[in-house]
Amino acid sequence: MAARRVSSLLSRSFSASSPLLFRSQGRNCYNGGILRRFGTSSAAAEEIINPSVQVSHTQLLINGNFVDSASGKTFPTLDPRTGEVIAHVAEGDAEDINRAVKAARTAFDEGPWPKMSAYERSRVLLRFADLVEKHSEELASLETWDNGKPYQQSLTAEIPMFARLFRYYAGWADKIHGLTIPADGNYQVHTLHEPIGVAGQIIPWNFPLLMFAWKVGPALACGNTIVLKTAEQTPLTAFYAGKLFLEAGLPPGVLNIVSGFGATAGAALASHMDVDKLAFTGSTDTGKVILGLAANSNLKPVTLELGGKSPFIVFEDADIDKAVELAHFALFFNQGQCCCAGSRTFVHEKVYDEFVEKSKARALKRVVGDPFRKGIEQGPQIDLKQFEKVMKYIKSGIESNATLECGGDQIGDKGYFIQPTVFSNVKDDMLIAQDEIFGPVQSILKFSDVDEVIKRANETKYGLAAGVFTKNLDTANRVSRALKAGTVWVNCFDVFDAAIPFGGYKMSGNGREKGIYSLNNYLQIKAVVTALNKPAWI
């Protein structure tokens, strides 16, 4: 039940009305209160809400202790609402990765965690989930402050799912076992499912806590130890979660957390000879680098969850109002900063014009502002680099002669707020239809028939997710099977239950996270063959 409740907050379906987290307050976001609030830097400063949470952990977590980086260096983590410094955190580098890997190796080879009964490991994960719920407001505040996503999204959707994921993996801890295999001859054969060892994990900035759970949960349930590198933009919630894990009774060295930059700390972790497994979520280009570093070191196995350019297909039989709302959610959720965002909206030619007009109207009603305010649907982009990238793609769309229906500009002159932007008359060869923008930019394309849209939807290097909106079950089944994507949502989108596997085809990555399949990422399978002398039953 908990999973279904959380999923309903993160999805849109035929039967649902506008979700509570993202409901419009009926204001025009371009000529109403938002521009008045963000029209000048002074007005923006007056309206900014200061979260009550204290930033108490900014050091690296190594071997059960919060410590400074070996170099003593720090770097700032910034508030996306203003671009101002929230706190300075320890800047880990290769030496700190070495320290963390050494702690994780010792904890795996000599510590109690892998030898602990699976039931006892599950109890630690359950205690951690309880502590997450106890400190949900602090975690949600830090997540929103560091990332810019709406506070209500953090508090009522992401934190409950964060706790749910760890309870899910706690349930798996004592159900991981091998098989007895009938083999020819006088032999008894069974398999052992053993923890893989020291797992290196690199998480992104768009969903810091959820990606923490997707990786840390299965690794711990299987009995591994971990070195986790945070995204440099969003280190704060990982450190807070690390503190809660220590309170829950996780032994020292089992979970080590290093903040730092990809070129230094990330590269050192990916190429480390004493790391047995690597998991990475981020861009496809960086994923290629990570895979190369892993291959050129000790050939450690790598799980990759990478970029996407997901098609969202609206057929002519669709309820247009519901399809517009779902397509809007599929793209604009989390400021458009979702790897699986429905960023290519394909609409049948018979309903195209109506769909475009209603999509424009919905975007104009989207409430953009300080994510700590009630009723806000969209906060700022994560940082200046991402802001400039999105604005570059908007300019490209205009120059490519796509029709700019609305948006396309910055809101205010402080922070990284972008108007919800809708393009129509988009062609497949335009950059806005090919590249992962990772921002609030909806591209609406026209199609004529099923075969055509299947072909066009699959003509991308990505294959992470897709959405299909139709009342026809035959169409839904046909298209779902034909699309080359790791997840296909039919009449819904962004449904993320703890048990549903997630991962990509093609250049969207390999392996699966969440669900039973994620356990395979962190297990070694050993076959044990024993000769039998005069077995009674042969």
Curated annotation (Swiss-Prot):
Function recorded in the entry: Possesses activity on acetaldehyde and glycolaldehyde in vitro.
Gene source species: Arabidopsis thaliana (Mouse-ear cress)
Catalytic activity from the UniProt record: an aldehyde + NAD(+) + H2O = a carboxylate + NADH + 2 H(+)
Subcellular location: Mitochondrion matrix
Domain of life: Eukaryota
Broad enzyme group: oxidoreductase
PROSITE patterns in the record: ALDEHYDE_DEHYDR_CYS, ALDEHYDE_DEHYDR_GLU
Designated name of the protein: Aldehyde dehydrogenase family 2 member B4, mitochondrial
Residue range covered by the transit peptide: 1-38
Active site: 305, 339
CDD domains found in the cross-reference section: ALDH_F2BC
Family assignment from sequence similarity: Belongs to the aldehyde dehydrogenase family.
Major localisation: mitochondrion
Molecular functions (GO terms): aldehyde dehydrogenase (NAD+) activity; ATP binding
InterPro entries for this protein: Ald_DH/histidinol_DH, Ald_DH_C, Ald_DH_CS_CYS, Ald_DH_CS_GLU, Ald_DH_N, Aldehyde_DH_dom
Gene Ontology CC terms, in alphabetical order: cytosol; mitochondrial matrix; mitochondrion
Lineage: Eukaryota, Viridiplantae, Streptophyta, Embryophyta, Tracheophyta
Quaternary assembly: Homotetramer.
Keyword vocabulary terms for this entry: Mitochondrion, NAD, Oxidoreductase, Transit peptide
One Pfam family named in its UniProt record: Aldedh
The enzyme's E.C. designation: 1.2.1.3
Site (Transition state stabilizer): 206
Protein residues bound to NAD(+): 282-287
Statement: the UniProt record of this protein carries the keyword Mitochondrion: yes
